[in-house]
């Protein structure tokens, strides 16, 4: 739970209170949710229907040009180009929640994401394997925790971001299991998560090196509790 601090003073016979509620996660709550019967059932479904013994990569964000979804997809395409032995052995789950309609910049971004996913799936997909699963619908929290828990790799590459709670939620959901977190160095979480593989989404070389390293760089991730 967030740690709260507050200060109060009397101003013109009214009490004014300032409350500080730092942004963060609740690792114990996430772990308890992961271990619940309902989420364990969802994890089983993911492993049976999507993972099927493959390496599973999860990326969760919003449909936003600052979130680096298009850069991530192009890096994944390059991975499949240079690593044909991974065809059929890896699947990317891209969950990016669509923005409110009516804003052209976000509609253009969503269209670009959908077209890129379609092109990559059409280029590399087989009858028994689809390289990318995409959803732009909001996923219930229990289900996203299940995806985090089932995923071997979490890939978060915003061009610029604040703390980025997704990275810390993945760490909490994988507690005791290990995992690989590929994280943009332009997130606040990059300085509070031990064991993350840092990358630069503006650099093809850095992105390629990071995702090449991730499948063999399984580690016990830890987020500093001082930031929630």
What do the PLM-derived regions correspond to, one by one?
Residues 81, 85-93, 149, 153, ...:
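Catalytic binding pocket for nucleotide-activated donors in carbohydrate/polymer assembly enzymes
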Residues 50-66, 73, 93:
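Conserved donor-binding/catalytic core segment of Leloir-type glycosyltransferases
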Residues 96-142:
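Nucleotide-activated donor-binding/catalytic signature segment of Leloir-type glycosyltransferases, i.e.
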Residues 24:
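Carbohydrate-associated surface elements
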Residues 140-151:
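Short acidic alpha-helix that forms the nucleotide-activated donor recognition element
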Residues 10-14, 32-57, 84-87:
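Nucleotide-sugar donor-binding and catalytic loop/hinge architecture
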Residues 1-8, 12, 220-228:
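Single conserved hydrophobic/aromatic residue that forms the stacking wall/gate
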Residues 67-69, 75, 164:
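Active-site helix-initiating loop/hinge in glycosyltransferases
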């Amino acid at each position: 739970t967030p740690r709260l601090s507050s200060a109060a003073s009397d101003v013109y016979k009214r009490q004014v209170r300032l409350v500080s509620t730092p942004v963060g996660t609740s690792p114990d709550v996430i772990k308890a949710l992961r271990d619940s019967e309902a989420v364990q059932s969802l994890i089983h479904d993911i492993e049976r229907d999507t993972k099927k013994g493959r390496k599973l990569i999860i990326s969760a964000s919003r449909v936003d040009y600052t979130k680096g979804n298009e850069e991530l997809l192009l890096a994944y395409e390059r991975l499949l180009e240079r690593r044909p032995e991974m065809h059929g052995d890896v699947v990317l789950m891209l969950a990016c929640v669509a923005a409110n309609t009516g804003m052209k910049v976000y509609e253009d971004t969503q269209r670009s994401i959908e077209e890129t996913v379609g092109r990559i799936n059409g280029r590399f997909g087989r009858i028994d394997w689809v390289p990318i699963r995409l959803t732009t619908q909001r996923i219930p929290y229990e289900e996203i925790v299940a995806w985090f828990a089932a995923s071997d790799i979490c890939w978060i590459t915003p061009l610029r971001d604040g703390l980025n709670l997704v990275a810390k939620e993945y760490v909490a959901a994988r507690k005791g299991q290990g995992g690989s977190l590929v994280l943009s160095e332009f997130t606040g979480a990059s300085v509070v998560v031990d064991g993350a593989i840092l990358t630069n989404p503006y650099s093809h070389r850095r992105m390629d090196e990071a995702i090449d390293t991730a499948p063999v760089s399984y580690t016990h991730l830890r987020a500093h509790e001082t930031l929630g």
